[in-house]
A protein has these predicted regions:
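Histidine/lysine/aspartate-rich catalytic loop segments that bind and position anionic ligands
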Residues: 88-136
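Active-site/ligand-binding-proximal alpha/beta "capping" segment
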Residues: 138-191
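Internal active-site segments that recognize and position negatively charged phosphoryl groups
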Residues: 60-99
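N-terminal positively charged helical leader segments and presequences
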Residues: 1-36, 136
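Acidic/glycine-rich phosphate/pyrophosphate-binding loops and surrounding catalytic core
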Residues: 34-60, 96
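Short amphipathic alpha-helix with an adjacent loop that forms part of the alpha/beta core around
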Residues: 54-57, 125-133, 149-156
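Structured adenosyl-cofactor binding patch, chiefly the S-adenosyl-L-methionine
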Residues: 41-43, 81-85, 96-112, 173-212
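Short beta->alpha connector loops at strand-helix junctions that form conserved
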Residues: 24-25, 67, 93-94, 116, ...
Length: 212
């Protein structure tokens, strides 16, 4: 890599000496990725061991919970919004898409490596787990008794978990029933719902305002 100049040289100067760096033609990078879209840089790494929910949520005040969100593009967009709008952590059910899937990581603009995240344990009630950690849970769902996102009752809560559901079906009815609050986003022109990634950005922004 001694012949590398320009911006690439600046990037390489930040790499620790024990990280091997290789250069290749664009055709080679395309073959490695399996598709033509590449930003000119690839990285291979070992997956870190995931922390427990309790470890991830230490000192957290506003977190997101993703129940069976399946689309990697949505996962990436949600992580990007979570980072930009001040969410402290993201928790996922095991049935959802992997945040480290390459499309999810790319759409997140790398924020899957910035926002703390982990999977919720299977076989136990994760709403109860979050309650034990001091969180009040907020289901984003369309119901007649849903609160507005700026409801003062939410403002009074020191620790909130915003719960978002899978594409299409949304949250399971049992999940909604187990949450402390149900909230909805007011919409116009007869539109009854938003894509989960778009809805997450609206909800995270409001929680950031509540968080001060």
């Amino acid at each position: 890599t001694k012949h590398v100049e320009g911006k690439a040289a600046e990037i390489l100067s930040r790499c620790p000496e024990d990280i091997p760096v290789y250069t290749a033609e664009l055709d080679v990078l395309t073959q490695l990725t399996g598709f033509k879209l590449t930003r000119g840089m690839l990285c291979a790494m070992r997956r870190p061991a995931l922390k427990s929910v309790a470890e991830i949520c230490t000192n957290a005040r506003r977190i997101a919970v993703l129940e069976n969100v399946m689309n990697p593009t949505n996962i990436g967009a949600i992580f990007r919004s979570a980072a930009a709008l001040g969410m402290d952590a993201v928790l996922l059910t095991a049935a959802g898409s992997d945040p480290l899937y390459r499309r999810a990581a790319r759409v997140s603009m790398g924020n899957v490596f910035l926002v703390p995240w982990t999977y919720l344990p299977e076989g136990e009630s994760w709403p109860d787990l979050l309650h034990d950690l001091g969180f009040r849970t907020v289901a984003l769902a369309l119901r007649e008794d849903s609160l507005a996102l700026n409801d003062p009752r939410l403002l009074a809560e020191p620790k909130l978990a915003m719960v978002l559901g899978t594409e299409g079906d949304g949250l399971a009815s049992s999940t909604i029933a187990s949450c402390d609050y149900t909230v909805k986003i007011p919409m116009s022109h007869g539109v009854d719902s938003l894509n989960v990634a778009a809805a997450s950005a609206v909800a995270f922004y409001q929680l950031a305002l509540l968080n001060g």
